[in-house]
């Protein structure tokens, strides 16, 4: 039995296995857990804060305002909205359920079949994890396994993600043209201009995240924490804002910023440091330009402090722009029932509920991801202690016969099969450990290898018979699950074509020459 001999290993004792899995960095406490603690939790928390702020609802309404009146408008709105939401949630099923509850009924009402409506939603929802800049949890594993800066991963993933979503847009357009499906009437949609004026600030956290990662080139962890602080400060400012308080809000922010910069320029210490005993330095400690840059970096803290003072001074004032997630409003209402207080109608109470609900939601989501990542750490640990990695590599190369195309097909099939019913992070870890060292031997760029695995693994969410995202969409659409999954698989075929394209043409990933030659 040649195959059996290929997987033969030396005899191992249980104490050796336990030692390797639990007390070394090659097992459960290896790279995946390290990444989940340092990076993944931070960005899951950021996604929770942004979603609870009401950004999720705003992005969905924005998608309908932009595309709703076009041919096949509801389906096109689903493509745009699910891309935004999937980028934040990092879960195909959660994204399908969240956005599908709004988009699928509208698609059915406009003339799409229930199966097609569910297929569109599940397909684009599973693709949300490939959309920069957040890209779900797997992006941070790519950073750690490849040693590629996060900004380079974001840049490389942009064109393939655009290609996938553009392909989905084209397919729903052709289906609308075939069925004669038009768009929604303008009276059913929010006015784009007024909608932007009421919620443009939801774009600020994403813009700041890109600035911190791509331009300022901060570490991933610091960029994440600073963006979370900025999101909390933004919601605090929105809660504190109304016509009566706006002069105090903006005046206080300007005064705080000026005081911060002046203190740094004159003493080298911030006002808080001086307040708690930092000694002033004679003469200017930093240049004016450096002081302004430092004050700008600390602007979210100033905004949060001024806004909280106004909220505490007038907790029941109006907040015309505050439109938090329904989960936050419900949580505040439950507090009212239990305590007999009127927190739901208080802007200060709603802000407090927002912070607590976001922390609760982020912690619950992170727990699920971290547990899955810990479990996935068993696989590389076992492969390392048994030495199966080399045997698997030799077997895969032998089966492929040295053909790169056949090797990629085998890798894609493995990613789809392993990914069925599994979180994306677990699938990615297993496939990268098994196949990651093999593909670069054929001259494939390391980043292309890891993005290839991510793309093909996401296909599992819409591939029969498991197709968890398609099942979730079928439940909302009240359609046949298998027919919905079949349609979703066909719609997602460009999720297979795109990774093959950037493997053979690394220029799609905007890789520099030295990056194309990198190996694991």
Give residue ranges: language-model regions.
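Membrane-interfacial helical/loop segments at transmembrane boundaries in membrane proteins
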Residues: 3-26, 267-293, 389-398, 403, ...
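Hydrophobic transmembrane alpha-helices
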Residues: 46-49, 84-85, 126-131, 372, ...
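Long, contiguous bundles of hydrophobic transmembrane helices that form the permeation core
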Residues: 155-364, 468-520
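Hydrophobic alpha-helical transmembrane segments in multi-pass membrane proteins
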Residues: 39, 43, 73-74, 82, ...
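Short, membrane-interfacial amphipathic segments enriched in basic
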Residues: 13-19, 52-57, 334-353, 382-386
């Amino acid at each position: 039995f040649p195959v059996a001999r290929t997987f033969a290993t030396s005899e191992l004792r249980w104490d050796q296995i336990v030692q390797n899995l639990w007390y070394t960095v090659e097992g459960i406490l290896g790279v995946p857990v390290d990444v989940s603690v340092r990076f993944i939790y931070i960005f899951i928390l950021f996604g929770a804060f942004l979603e609870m702020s009401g950004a999720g609802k705003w992005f969905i309404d924005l998608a309908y305002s932009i595309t709703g009146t076009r041919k096949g408008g509801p389906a096109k709105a689903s493509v745009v909205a699910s891309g935004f939401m999937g980028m934040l949630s990092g879960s195909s099923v959660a994204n399908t359920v969240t956005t599908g509850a709004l988009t699928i009924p509208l698609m059915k009402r406009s003339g799409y079949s229930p199966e097609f409506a569910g297929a569109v939603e599940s397909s684009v929802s599973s693709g949300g994890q490939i959309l920069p800049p957040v890209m779900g949890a797997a992006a941070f594993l790519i950073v750690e396994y490849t040693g590629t800066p996060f900004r380079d991963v974001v840049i490389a993933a942009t064109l393939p993600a655009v290609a996938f979503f553009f392909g989905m847009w084209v397919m729903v357009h052709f289906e609308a043209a075939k069925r004669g499906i038009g768009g929604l009437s303008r009276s059913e949609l929010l006015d784009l201009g007024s909608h932007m004026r009421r919620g443009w600030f939801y774009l600020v956290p994403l813009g700041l995240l890109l600035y911190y990662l791509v331009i300022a080139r901060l570490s991933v962890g610091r960029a994440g924490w600073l963006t979370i602080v900025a999101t909390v400060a933004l919601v605090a400012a929105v809660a504190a804002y109304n016509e009566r308080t706006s002069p105090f809000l903006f005046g206080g922010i300007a005064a705080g910023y000026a005081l911060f910069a002046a203190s740094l320029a004159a003493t080298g210490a911030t006002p808080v440091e001086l307040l708690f005993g930092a000694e002033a330095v004679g003469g200017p400690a930093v240049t004016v330009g450096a002081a302004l840059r430092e004050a700008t970096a600390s602007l979210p803290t100033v905004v949060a402090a001024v806004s909280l003072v106004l909220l505490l001074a007038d907790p029941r004032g109006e907040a015309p722009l505050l439109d938090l997630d329904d989960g936050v409003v419900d949580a505040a209402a439950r507090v009212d029932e239990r305590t007999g207080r009127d927190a739901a109608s208080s802007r200060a109470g709603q802000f407090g509920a927002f912070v607590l609900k976001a922390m609760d939601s982020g912690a619950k989501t992170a727990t699920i991801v971290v547990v899955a990542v810990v479990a996935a750490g068993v696989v590389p640990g076992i492969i390392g202690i048994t030495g199966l990695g080399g045997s698997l590599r030799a077997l895969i190369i032998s089966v492929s016969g040295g053909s790169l195309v056949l090797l990629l097909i085998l890798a894609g099939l493995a990613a789809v099969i392993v990914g069925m019913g599994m979180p994306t992070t677990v699938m990615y870890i297993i496939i990268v450990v098994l196949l990651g060292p093999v593909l670069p031997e054929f001259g494939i760029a390391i980043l292309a290898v890891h993005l290839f695995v991510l793309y093909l693994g996401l296909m599992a969410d819409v591939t029969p018979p498991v197709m968890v995202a398609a099942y979730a969409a079928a439940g909302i659409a009240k359609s046949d699950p298998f027919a919905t999954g079949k349609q979703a698989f066909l719609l997602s075929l460009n999720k297979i074509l795109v990774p093959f394209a950037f493997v053979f043409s690394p220029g799609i990933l905007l890789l520099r020459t030295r990056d194309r030659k990198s190996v694991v």
